[in-house]
């Protein structure tokens, strides 16, 4: 059967096979699609453009954050590549909440929530407009997993592109990232630096647009996209302001058309248990963001794979730390790029059996084929796995009576992985920040911030503001901090987050009282409150749930839907199916 479109100049003929292959034909072909084509013509598309495959390009370009401001020229280059290869690019945008600007106030409740909004909005546009394929850009922290989740949910030929990091700053010969500005506030409070120095750091630490320069959440998830095979090989560490990024995007535009022609590989072909383990391995190997322990299960959920914080923790425990990267180490993303890129890490982990090189990538080739020619570790930025910085990874998942379903700590850079102290309980982040600003806390205390989990926050706020103050005051390893909220990828010190179950739903964190003794033993992956079980049982009987903080609006809807941290704090379970497009 052939369909004639008399409304189109030149008449379009599409047989059943192509109708099945190109989803967009449901919007472009046939007599009754004349109104649809009219809308397309109003956007400047001619007959030839309407007849070609429609490729969506999603980004967050805008003025919310410098992290996404590299997207503009990269998207333009991707459009060129698509057009050169015979496709019609269709650009659209989605939300982004700057983790930096929303930090340490109520706005941070929207950060993790925005990850779900991004995935949802990609699903809405790609399926709502029946695009044939997708190129998705990420920049600020939650945009990367949000886009990857959206890609896997839609399951059309897709390429993820990380927009790249900023260049590091310099003051007095010292390399800076934005973390230095957070910690400098604490240093100023103690008198270690003066206001002039604080201002110089503020003005110098982010000299260009692009995401934060250390191995914080954005760069971590950029590397994860490589280790999982969802992006063009060895591009994640190219700084966002480099002209090379235009070449990368133009290549992506051509490659997406090749993927569309051959029918894949599709995101759910790429996202497997093995590729998820590869993603977890590169997090551990580089001392990456603890947020990855939340994002990997969320990506897995979109593919229908049960991959929880326990699975992430197993990979963390068997993977050596070989990346000497900030915040636990010395170097930045640019330094990794200068020695050969993420390929150096990936190939070293493939060589030593910590990454499965047989996993497929978007190119149709395996990781081993794509990364086999990578440079060897330089021994300074990236160590050999046979002589690692640490033998068992820079991030750890803890269990114990305080976190029966798990908690996460970044151990990279810690002088000691053991801490025992007495609890000082705060019912929200603001109360703890006030105590730290007043310096009304002391060495040996375990600062407990609760009711900041996915439901209780709601939104599971990041605590970089308070952890950086503590570190800047020289107390980073003299106290511990525990929370059912999250940490920034830039957090360092004895900080344990993602405690689950969260306090708001009756998790053990809700039972902690001032003066309770708490033991943290990261070496043995344990965290416990040293309180007798009869006393804990009595506290459980007395515990009463708190009223929700939001009864209407977006956060109220989020709180009703969101799950706990071990499963990724997702708002639905399992893969979305669209049989209409199958």
Curated annotation (Swiss-Prot):
It is an enzyme of class 4 (lyase). Signal peptide: none annotated. Binds 1 [2Fe-2S] cluster per subunit. This cluster acts as a Lewis acid cofactor. The active site is at 488 (proton acceptor). Coiled coil: none annotated. Its EC number is 4.2.1.9. One of its GO terms (molecular function) is 2 iron, 2 sulfur cluster binding. Pfam families: ILV_EDD_C (PF24877), ILVD_EDD_N (PF00920). The modification N6-carboxylysine is found at residue 142. Pathway: Amino-acid biosynthesis; L-isoleucine biosynthesis; L-isoleucine from 2-oxobutanoate: step 3/4; Amino-acid biosynthesis; L-valine biosynthesis; L-valine from pyruvate: step 3/4. GO terms for biological process: branched-chain amino acid biosynthetic process; isoleucine biosynthetic process; L-valine biosynthetic process. [2Fe-2S] cluster binds at residues 67, 140, 212. Mg(2+) binds at residues 99, 141-142, 462. Its cofactor is [2Fe-2S] cluster; Mg(2+). Homodimer. Belongs to the IlvD/Edd family. Functions in the biosynthesis of branched-chain amino acids. Catalyzes the dehydration of (2R,3R)-2,3-dihydroxy-3-methylpentanoate (2,3-dihydroxy-3-methylvalerate) into 2-oxo-3-methylpentanoate (2-oxo-3-methylvalerate) and of (2R)-2,3-dihydroxy-3-methylbutanoate (2,3-dihydroxyisovalerate) into 2-oxo-3-methylbutanoate (2-oxoisovalerate), the penultimate precursor to L-isoleucine and L-valine, respectively. This is Dihydroxy-acid dehydratase 3. It comes from Bradyrhizobium diazoefficiens (strain JCM 10833 / BCRC 13528 / IAM 13628 / NBRC 14792 / USDA 110). The gene is ilvD3.
């Amino acid at each position: 059967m052939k369909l004639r479109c008399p409304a189109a100049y030149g008449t379009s003929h599409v047989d059943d096979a192509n109708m099945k292959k190109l989803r967009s034909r449901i919007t472009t072909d046939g007599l009754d699609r004349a109104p649809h084509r009219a809308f397309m013509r109003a956007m400047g598309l001619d007959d030839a453009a309407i007849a070609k495959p429609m490729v969506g390009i999603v980004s967050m370009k805008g003025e919310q954050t410098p992290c996404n401001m590299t997207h503009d020229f990269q998207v333009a280059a991707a459009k060129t590549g698509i057009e050169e290869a015979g496709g019609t690019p269709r650009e659209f945008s989605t939300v982004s909440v700057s983790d930096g600007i929303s930090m340490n106030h109520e706005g941070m409740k929207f950060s993790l929530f925005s990850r779900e909004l991004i995935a949802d909005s990609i699903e809405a546009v790609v399926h709502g407009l029946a695009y044939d394929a997708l190129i998705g850009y990420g920049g600020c922290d939650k945009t990367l997993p949000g886009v990857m989740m959206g890609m896997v949910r839609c399951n059309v030929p897709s390429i993820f592109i990380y927009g790249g990091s900023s260049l590091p700053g310099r003051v007095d010969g010292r390399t800076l990232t934005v973390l230095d500005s957070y910690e400098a506030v604490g240093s100023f409070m103690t008198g270690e630096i003066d206001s002039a120095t604080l201002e110089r750091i503020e003005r110098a630490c982010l000299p260009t647009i692009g995401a934060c320069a250390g191995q914080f959440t954005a760069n971590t998830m950029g590397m994860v996209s490589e280790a999982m095979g969802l992006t063009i090989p060895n591009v994640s560490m190219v700084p966002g302001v480099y002209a090379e990024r235009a070449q990368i995007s133009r290549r992506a535009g051509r490659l997406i058309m090749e993927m569309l022609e051959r029918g894949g590989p599709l995101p759910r072909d790429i996202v497997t248990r093995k590729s998820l383990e590869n993603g977890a391995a590169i997090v551990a190997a580089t001392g990456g963001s603890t947020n990855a322990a939340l994002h990997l299960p969320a990506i897995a959920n979109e593919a229908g794979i049960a991959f929880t914080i326990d699975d992430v923790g197993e990979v963390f425990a068997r993977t050596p730390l070989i990346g000497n990267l900030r915040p636990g180490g010395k170097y930045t993303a640019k330094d990794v790029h200068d020695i050969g890129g993420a390929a150096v890490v990936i190939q070293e982990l493939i060589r030593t059996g910590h990454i499965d090189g047989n996993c497929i990538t978007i190119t149709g080739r395996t990781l081993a084929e794509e990364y086999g020619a990578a440079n060897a570790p330089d021994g300074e930025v990236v160590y050999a796995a046979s002589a690692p910085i640490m033998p068992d990874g820079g991030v750890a998942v803890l269990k114990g009576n305080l976190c029966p379903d798990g908690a996460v700590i970044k151990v990279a850079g810690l002088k000691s992985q053991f801490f025992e102290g007495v609890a000082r309980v705060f019912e929200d982040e603001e109360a703890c920040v006030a105590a730290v600003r007043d310096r009304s806390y002391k060495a040996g205390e375990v600062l407990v911030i609760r009711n900041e989990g996915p439901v209780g926050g709601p939104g599971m706020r990041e605590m970089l503001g308070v952890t950086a103050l503590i570190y800047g005051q020289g107390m980073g390893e003299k106290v511990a901090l525990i929370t059912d909220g999250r940490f920034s990828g830039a957090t360092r010190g004895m900080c344990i987050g993602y405690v689950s179950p969260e306090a708001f739903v009756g998790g053990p964190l809700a039972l902690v009282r001032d003066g309770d003794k708490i033991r943290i033993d990261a070496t043995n992956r344990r965290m416990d409150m040293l309180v007798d079980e009869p006393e804990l049982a009595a506290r459980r009987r007395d515990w009463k749930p708190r009223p929700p903080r939001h009864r209407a609006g977006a956060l109220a809807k989020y709180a009703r839907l969101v799950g706990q941290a071990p499963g990724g704090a997702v708002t639905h379970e399992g893969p979305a199916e669209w049989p209409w497009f199958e």
